[in-house]
């Protein structure tokens, strides 16, 4: 197969969903039927191939996205299995950035759950074409049609139903293919490997006709010629329908909806056919955004084997046998082991050593990889998540990933001096793997503080520290990661002078600080940032080589705010004027001046304390509703909605994280263990003044 053709045959897909929707089981079945796995792994037995970290097998949840390659028909499918737990949304975000398409798995009983919404919005952000697989159709209470309605109501999506279930709950035995207008039935005893087509059951004919008509109404809109044919009463062929479904899926005009039961081995092969038929190849995506290093210009780069090499590092993982592995998605060109490339973000050269194709935790050495491939590189020295690897002669930086601020933190103290050294190494390795995990030192207490996206996230980090790095540590109680911001525009003109014999220091900076939400001409790429720096220096008042010193100084000093020492976020700093000295000025002098300007200027911006607000969803039987709402209100909660779901009620509320510690026990006692909740980070908001006073006093 020529390299150009090869691109058409690749599908880079992610499988993502809410925790427990059956995502890992679906991936396991895909690996089984594509011949990569000889024994089906069951998540609840701790044997799933994709869940290869010890903690994952114990907890039955997927934490890191394992990448794996398999084949179906004549296509190569690279699958990334992503975690569904809210504490690991960063893993999902990283995966979506490098995927061309996704399969969103939904629980046929629960429908669209909070984490499904989060993943869906993340996929929207990266314009990832996707299709939906309504799983667990064999379970009691499964309702395919309600799930389809929830896709419309909750996600605002346009579902295109291309399959209907045959039988419900324990009688679920197959699907109706609305393209071929045939029923596909699985033999129970053959582990799903044997299935056959038959005529649509008589009692489902009307329903199938109704949904077939809806399908045709939606797809013919994409092609005038086919629409004319359809309106004049001519038959639209299966080939034409497939072509239009593919066109509509790639352009996100609609999302094909399929159904099945991965656990019962039903519906997986048609899902694979749909991945191949409807999800895009790298060629369909066509371009990737980035910047040409030599000119600084933003450009669209074609995805092609013949272009110079460019790849994005999207994951770092420690492999017990190979050491550090960097997963990359190659967008253009090709590499062979032994080549030297450049990390354009860090401006460091990297030599490509071992190159591996991964199958969950098995690996296959390859000598060459090209555009469209997802491979793991062993032993890179300076590359971290989000960096670009590029051809040395034609350097590009691909669009970077933005990572969310951590919302929870806790102190860790090593139990012995030996643990102290090991802990430093362990934490820096774990932080390199996971950009949503941060490590810092509290300057007042000297304690090491770790920060993450939730209690489970930090629990697993600590667990890995113990298991993989053999570090014993004492763990403090979880703390809320407060932030600070300014609420009005302020300006500061600061001069830093130091003369004590020998070379002196001189730097003058004039900086305007303003809240991000008040910046009128904010660029699109700056809208999701927490700190924006801009220089408006004209006429060389501050030479170009000193300006990075100002940005670096501000970026460092904003980590310790002016109210209670929490990081300062959501503001823009504009350098508008300054002065320098031919001999005494330096990058360091401007860095010091910027820090002092921040310390003096920020208090004039009416600074406020911010706290993380979580979106909490509680599912409860009717009889406990009153008590639960009363309790949520007492936690400074704001109820957003109340909806019936089956014979339960779903309450959605925005609640400060500070009020949610230990909520699981309260909810258990309020509902006699019958209610459940999930929690997701929503936004940062100002802390009420009486609460802010208590927080400041504790500092």
Curated annotation (Swiss-Prot):
UniProt-listed GO biological process terms: ribosome disassembly
PROSITE patterns per record: G_TR_1, G_TR_2
SMART domains: EFG_C, EFG_IV
Binding site for GTP: 17-24, 81-85, 135-138
Keyword field: Cytoplasm, Elongation factor, GTP-binding, Nucleotide-binding, Protein biosynthesis
Domain of life (superkingdom): Bacteria
InterPro entries membership: EF-G-like_DII, EFG_II, EFG_III, EFG_III/V, EFG_IV, EFG_V, EFG_V-like, G_TR_CS
Compartments where found: Cytoplasm
Keyword flag Lipid metabolism: no
UniProt domain tr-type G: residue ranges: 8-283
SUPFAM superfamilies, per the entry: EF-G C-terminal domain-like, P-loop containing nucleoside triphosphate hydrolases, Ribosomal protein S5 domain 2-like, Translation proteins
CDD domains in the cross-refs: EF-G, EFG_III, EFG_mtEFG1_IV, EFG_mtEFG_C, EFG_mtEFG_II
GO MF entries: GTP binding; GTPase activity; translation elongation factor activity
Gene Ontology cellular-component annotations: cytoplasm
Family assignment from sequence similarity: Belongs to the TRAFAC class translation factor GTPase superfamily. Classic translation factor GTPase family. EF-G/EF-2 subfamily.
Task performed by this protein: Catalyzes the GTP-dependent ribosomal translocation step during translation elongation. During this step, the ribosome changes from the pre-translocational (PRE) to the post-translocational (POST) state as the newly formed A-site-bound peptidyl-tRNA and P-site-bound deacylated tRNA move to the P and E sites, respectively. Catalyzes the coordinated movement of the two tRNA molecules, the mRNA and conformational changes in the ribosome.
Record's protein name: Elongation factor G
Gene coding for it: fusA
């Amino acid at each position: 197969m020529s390299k150009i053709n090869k691109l058409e045959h690749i599908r880079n897909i992610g499988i993502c969903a809410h925790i427990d929707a059956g995502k890992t089981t679906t991936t396991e079945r895909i690996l089984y039927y594509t011949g990569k796995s000889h024994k089906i792994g069951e998540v609840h037995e701790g044997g799933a191939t994709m869940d290869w970290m010890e903690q994952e097998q114990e907890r039955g949840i997927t934490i890191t996205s394992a990448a794996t390659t398999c084949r179906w028909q004549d296509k190569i499918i690279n699958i990334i299995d992503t975690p569904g737990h809210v504490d690991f949304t960063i893993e999902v975000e990283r995966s979506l950035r490098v995927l061309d398409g996704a399969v969103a798995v939904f629980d046929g009983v629960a429908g669209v759950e909070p984490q499904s919404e989060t993943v869906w919005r993340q996929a929207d952000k990266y314009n990832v074409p996707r299709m939906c697989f309504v799983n667990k159709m064999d379970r009691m209470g499964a309702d395919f049609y309600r799930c389809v309605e929830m896709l419309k109501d909750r996600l605002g999506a346009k579902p295109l139903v291309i399959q209907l279930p045959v039988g419900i709950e324990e009688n679920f035995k197959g699907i109706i293919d609305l393209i071929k207008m045939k029923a596909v039935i699985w033999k129970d005893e053959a582990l799903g490997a044997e299935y056959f087509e038959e005529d649509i059951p008589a009692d489902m004919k009307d329903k199938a006709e109704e949904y077939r008509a809806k399908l045709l109404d939606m797809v013919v809109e994409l092609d005038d010629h086919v629409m004319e044919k359809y309106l004049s009463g001519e038959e639209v062929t299966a080939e034409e329908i497939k072509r239009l479904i593919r066109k509509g899926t790639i352009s996100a005009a609609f999302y094909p909806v399929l159904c099945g039961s991965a656990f019962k081995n039903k519906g997986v092969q048609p899902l694979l056919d749909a991945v191949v038929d409807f999800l895009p190849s790298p060629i369909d995506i066509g371009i990737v955004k980035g910047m040409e290093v030599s000119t600084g210009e933003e450009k669209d780069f074609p995805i092609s084997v013949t272009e110079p090499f460019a790849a994005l590092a999207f994951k770092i993982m420690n492999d017990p046998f190979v050491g550090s592995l960097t997963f990359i998605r190659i967008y253009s060109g090709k590499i062979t082991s032994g080549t030297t490339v450049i990390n354009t973000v860090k401006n460091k050269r990297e030599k490509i050593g071992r190159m591996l194709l991964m199958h969950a935790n098995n690996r296959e050495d390859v000598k060459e990889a090209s555009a469209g491939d997802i491979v793991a590189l062993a032993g890179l020295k300076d590359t971290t998540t989000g960096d670009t690897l590029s051809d040395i002669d034609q350097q590009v930086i691909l669009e970077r990933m933005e990572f969310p601020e951590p919302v929870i933190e806790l102190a860790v103290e090593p139990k012995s001096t030996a643990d102290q050294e090991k802990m430093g190494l362990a934490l820096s390795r774990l932080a390199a793997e996971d950009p949503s995990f941060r490590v810092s030192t509290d300057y007042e207490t000297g304690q090491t503080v770790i920060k993450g996206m939730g209690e489970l996230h930090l629990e697993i980090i600590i667990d890995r520290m113990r298991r993989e790095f053999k570090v014993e540590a004492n763990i403090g109680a979880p703390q809320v990661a407060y932030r600070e911001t300014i609420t009005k525009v302020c300006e500061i003109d600061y001069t830093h002078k130091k003369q004590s014999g020998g070379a002196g220091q001189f730097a003058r900076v004039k900086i305007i600080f303003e809240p991000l939400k008040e910046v009128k001409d904010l660029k699109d790429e700056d809208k999701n940032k927490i700190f924006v720096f801009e220089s408006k220096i004209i006429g060389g008042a501050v030479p170009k080589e000193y300006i990075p010193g100002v940005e670096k100084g501000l970026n460092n000093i904003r980590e310790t705010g002016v109210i209670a020492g929490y990081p300062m976020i959501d503001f823009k700093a504009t350098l508008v004027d300054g002065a320098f000295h031919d001999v005494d000025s330096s990058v360091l002098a401007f860095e010091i001046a910027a820090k002092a300007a921040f310390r003096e200027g920020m208090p004039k911006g009416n600074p406020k304390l911010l706290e993380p607000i979580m979106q909490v969803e509680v599912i409860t039987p009717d009889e406990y509703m009153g008590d639960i709402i009363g309790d949520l209100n007492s936690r400074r909660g704001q109820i957003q909605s109340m909806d019936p779901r089956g014979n339960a009620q779903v309450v959605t509320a925005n609640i400060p994280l500070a009020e949610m510690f230990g909520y699981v026990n309260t909810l258990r006692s309020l509902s006699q263990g019958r209610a459940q909740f999930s929690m997701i980070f929503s936004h940062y908001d100002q802390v009420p003044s009486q609460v802010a006073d208590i927080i400041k006093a504790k500092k």
